From Swiss-Prot:
Family membership noted in the UniProt record: Belongs to the MYG1 family.
Miscellaneous: Present with 6080 molecules/cell in log phase SD medium.
GO CC annotation terms, alphabetical: chromatin; cytoplasm; nucleus
Stored InterPro entries: MYG1_exonuclease (IPR003226)
Protein name: MYG1 protein YER156C
Domain of life: Eukaryota
Coiled coil ranges: none
Any single GO BP term: positive regulation of cellular respiration
A Pfam entry, by short name: MYG1_exonuc
Length: 338
């Protein structure tokens, strides 16, 4: 399906959500929670069943029913299902992705109390899917994060299944040697849905109330960069904020990609930091590092060797440094550009 359809619901009627019984996973745990954030499903009854009679009596089915129509049925297990979030994505959707695709904008607006503009809503809609929901889709559909050749002998250095959200949700199912009645599974599912839903709401609020407002600060710093240094390679933020993704996006918008190399900002103690700009938002490789001879030095030794008073540290890897004043971190950045 190419278009995103929404079912028109009669809010005066009591709604019923249905998902499958038995063992549960992260995707339907989140899908059910997201639906219940919406006014039309806030007080909906939840039925966990594989009985077609229960499906027929329900208003919406997630992760069960063997079909997807974007109105009542939101399953992804059937043959021939290859739906993705949009044409930019290749990951096949799970029930979490399907519900978010159709209801995500309304879900975000509900979490943020409708305090979001149309353009910002579109940005958050993509951001939340990319940073959170897509990974659940991939996990449930058995899609690896990496494309690894079949003949590869790569082995992980450690196991992280138990600390991943899908792993935690899986562990919330009843143990095999405990009560495994439908009632027990339903109680455990309710706890799992609340757990992953809480993580999701915290994430959306963080993006809407912290990450998104930071864009204006980064944009202003970029616009004023020539007042900081004539090279245009250093920007100053009035305080720390999530800046990396905004920096890359704004560079593209302003056609100045890869030109900014250092970001100055205050930390929580009131001291100043100079950060290199990574080649991407998750990399420790940087466009330009702090001076090699100063890496790993601290305090007086660093101040003496650099000739810059008030230095605190430069990380041994050269990606960040600290000092007591804006002037000091500016000088460290300038030394790196020389």
């Amino acid at each position: 399906m190419n278009s995103v359809k929404r079912v028109k619901l009669n809010s005066k009627m009591s709604k019923q959500i249905c998902t499958h019984s038995g063992s549960f996973h992260a995707d339907e745990s989140l899908a059910v929670y997201m639906l219940r954030l919406l006014p039309e499903f806030k007080d909906a009854k939840l039925v966990r069943s594989r009985n077609p009679k229960d499906w027929e009596a329900s208003d919406i089915l997630v992760d069960v029913g063997a079909q997807y129509d974007g109105v009542k049925f939101f399953d992804h297990h059937q043959r021939g299902f290859f739906e993705t979030f949009n044409e930019k994505y290749k990951t096949k959707l799970s029930s979490a992705g399907l519900i978010f695709k159709h209801y995500g904008r309304d879900i975000i607006k509900t979490i943020l109390n409708n305090k979001v503009s149309s353009s910002d809503l579109d940005l958050l809609y993509d951001k939340v899917y990319k940073q959170f929901v897509e990974a659940l889709d991939a996990n449930d559909n058995g899609i690896s994060k990496y494309t690894i050749p079949k003949d590869s002998n790569l082995e992980p250095n450690f196991r992280d299944n138990a600390i991943s959200i899908p792993g935690i949700i899986s562990g919330m199912n009843p143990n095999w040697n405990e009560d495994t009645s439908d009632e027990s599974f339903d109680r455990c599912f309710a706890r799992a849905s609340e757990f992953i839903g809480g993580v999701f709401v915290t994430l959306v609020r963080g993006y809407g109330q912290s990450w998104l407002p930071a864009k204006a600060l980064v944009a202003q710093a970029i616009d004023e960069r020539m007042d900081v240094d004539k090279s245009g390679k250093i920007i100053v933020l009035p305080q720390f904020c999530p800046w990396k993704e905004h920096l890359y996006e704004l560079e593209r918008e302003k056609n100045i990609e890869k030109q900014i190399e250092f970001v100055l900002f205050t930390d929580s103690s009131g001291a100043w930091r100079v950060s290199t700009v990574p080649i991407n938002s998750t990399s420790f490789q940087f466009r330009r590092g702090l001076p090699e001879p100063l890496r790993g030095l601290r305090d007086e030794e660093l101040s003496t060797k650099s000739g810059v008073p008030g230095c605190i540290f430069i990380h041994a890897a050269g990606f960040i440094g600290g000092a007591k004043s804006k002037e000091a971190v500016y000088e460290l950045a300038k030394m790196s550009l020389a």
